[in-house]
Amino acid sequence: MLPADVPLCHLGPSVLLLLQLLLPSASAFFPNIWSLLAAPGSITHQDLTEEAALNVTLHLFLEQPPPGRPPLRLEDFLGRTLLADDLFAAYFGPGSPSRRFRAALGEVSRANAAQDFLPTSKNDPDLHFDAERLGQGRTRLVEALRETVAAAKALDYTLARQRLGAALHALQDFYSHSNWVELGRQQPHPHLLWPRQELRSLAQAGDPTCSDCEELSCPGNLLGFTLLTSGYFGTRPSKPPGKCSHGGHFDQSSSQPPRGGINKDSTSPGFSPHHMLHLQAAKLALLASIQAFNLLQSRLGDRGFSRLLDITPASSLSFVLDTTGSMGEEINAAKIQARHIVEQRRGTPMEPTQYVLVPFHDPGFGPVFTTSDPDSFWQQLNEMHALGGGDEPEMCLSALELALLHTPPLSDIFVFTDASPKDAFLTNRVESLTQERRCRVTFLVTEDPSRAQGRARREVLSPLRFEPYEAVALASGGEVIFTEDQYIQDVAAIVGDSIADLVTLPLEPRVVVAERPLVFRVDGLLQKVTVRIHGEVSSFWIRNPAGVSQGQEEGEGPLGHTHRFGRFWMVRVNDPPQSGTWEIQVTAKGTPRVRVQAQTSLDFLFHFGIPMEDGPHPGLYPLTQPVAGLQTQLLVEVTGLGSRGGPGGPLPHFSHVVLRGVPQGAELGQVPLEPRGPPERGLLAASLPPTLLSTSGPFSLELVGQDGVGRGLHRAAPQPCAVVPVLLELSGPRGFLAPGTTAPLSLRIASFSGPQDLHLRTSAKPSFALTSNLSRVHLEQNEAAWGRLWLEVPDTAASDSVVMVTVTAKNGEASTMPPTHAFLRLLVQAPAPQDQLPAPAYSTDPVLNTSRPAFHFFTSVTQGGAGGGLVGNPWWTTFGVMLLLLGLGPW
């Protein structure tokens, strides 16, 4: 093992090469990059988290050469910005989408930043290594890492990423909030991840640690000692005499003697009295974050770790199947498509990462079957057959809700049924859940809603009985396709198409209007364009920018190949499609559906944020949907910017976003997109107009810009958004749920737009007993209320099972505002015995080393004190602190 005080210049050439990647040049410890208007040039928690993840991903790619492709070389990444798009293109092949990986990193980064914003965490000193609570902070850090591993092993990667974000926040805060850097330490603390190793040389309650400093910058306010300390923040707990403050604009304790502080969160003296040590603290926090990632990798294995960060271009395959007696053809169609996907993609980068199967059959639904093994999935699906019965309606939305709970974000879910939903009361909740999970739902319905024939019915059914499916499909960015039994196998072929990374091209107008063509735009970064039309169509034609047309005749045409399956038409446009404006003219009875999709690596992720100024640090608190009355930012992350007109050509860019009403498509406004950080990161922000934030209806986002050679680009968000009337925050207990216990939950509800009379409903899935002390609440503008919930976990609750708690806030019956939902995922785990750790390999005596090793900062476009040598074993592995660096030695 490598002693902790070995100078980095002695680590060898391969390690020094890696360090060029590790160290950003100038640009935690503000929460996210959106904080940097307050302190330009600072390194944030988001920077540290993403840089660490990219480095570990590169390490994983270097260790495992891609099948059928040349191995990656570390030298090819030196002196360049380390970007997810470049890593995926080098490993999986040009154009391989990194969208899911970047979305997973976004989940971790937002959970990290949320520690500074959530009411239950922002002022807890144990979660930030504040107030000299170093032992307690280490305990909470290790707990969060344990919870990350447990959630990942239970296949709940969303919860695992949330706990990982919390763990990384605490780990990174240690180097900014303590005096580890001031003690001259050049490497991460050797004991933070070792719960059985004592933290030595800690300042005690009676030890004075700081002198008074009346300036913003306080380089010499630490007293001359070799004890480890950290600053006090705010008033809880109160700062004892002689102790250091955190310091900065937001810290009330810094005005009490001794004034000043020691935090290194930013480059600004107004926020960070030890701003001059910001880069040194960031370097150690980055190395420690890499160490934590590697330790998780050793515990989860390469496959489990890859799932944790979604290091794959592939999506998941999720089926919700009606198994009533009339569904034989549909079940066979699902089997055929699943078998085709399994056989075609096995062993390739596009092999689905997870398979989810949920059956339903009145009066029941489930259980859910989840696996990453294609053979197990196929066996389970192959054993599924149509059962007796056949009454309409069925428990479809309950089964879909269960699938959403277990399907990874950014996935497609396919529902096969010939019945309307019996549980239509779940429609709003399922709509919100699809948007929270960013999952697209496609319903394949083998029943014409206008016919009265088909399966047995208990009553005369309304022609509007399928409207809940339409609502869920619209909210999720999916669609409802009506077909007949004889065509279901052909129509189901869209399953194989849809699990590729597709974008839906915006149409103008959004719906078919008589005698008016639909217009869509094709750019040079699109391929495999597909036009789907379904309805009572009598004729249609498609025209390309050159004026070449093709009608509805089946077979090969001048623009592509046309297939017809009853009332469903599909045109596969020849590659490469001509760039420019295309038109579609449809003549039909009723309102036909038209959908245009294409494959591309250039896409975008987005979320919303509100400026926070009352927490420990400035930043943007992330939201799934904007909240009425709150100044809201749209935050965009463009993926696939490696796509350009030619090698070395200029990057594509987006200049503004168009906001449109849903479903008609009327323009609600345009707002400019402002870049944040280097252009190659693809980070953009826009302020939503106040007029939009008073709109109760859904709206869509369309990004507009140019490719690298000046041609137009249009990308639409896959799902519509909506302004919600109130802010709901739901938080759970520390750790996991244990069978046979009652878990307390906290609820905060706030209004920023005016008086609200709200009815609150709570539910848990599975159906655990859930009680609340808040069922109705009246709020005035800028008023909030707190509530408590108690979740009873039965003795029979299965370990490693996921519980989803939902709180719904709905205005009075006369209100047209949609309800607001908050979702909380919790994991049930039986208490485990304490980990038995081997004895230290050698002495744990502190080794003081205040001399600085001969380390040189390398230019990259990316971004001796307490304790002693590298000793002992962490609770999950035997690797050492410099694991990643040691692992590169043989290279």
From Swiss-Prot:
Ranges for region Disordered: 238-273
Domain of life the protein comes from: Eukaryota
Bilayer-crossing regions: none
First and last residue of the signal peptide: 1-28
Chain positions carrying an annotated carbohydrate: 55, 773, 849
Chief site of localization: secreted
Cell location: Secreted
Any Pfam family: VWA_4
Keywords assigned by UniProt, alphabetized: Glycoprotein, Secreted, Signal
SUPFAM superfamilies the record matches: vWA-like (SSF53300)
Any single GO CC term annotated in Swiss-Prot or TrEMBL for this entry: extracellular region
Alphabetical list of InterPro entries matching this protein: GBD_Hemicentin/VWA7, HMCN1-like_VWA, VWA7, VWA7_N, vWFA_dom_sf
Keyword Glycoprotein set for record: yes
Keyword match Iron: no
Residues in VWFA domain copies: 314-507
Name of the protein in question: von Willebrand factor A domain-containing protein 7
Species, as recorded: Bos taurus (Bovine)
Lineage, top ranks: Eukaryota, Metazoa, Chordata, Craniata, Vertebrata
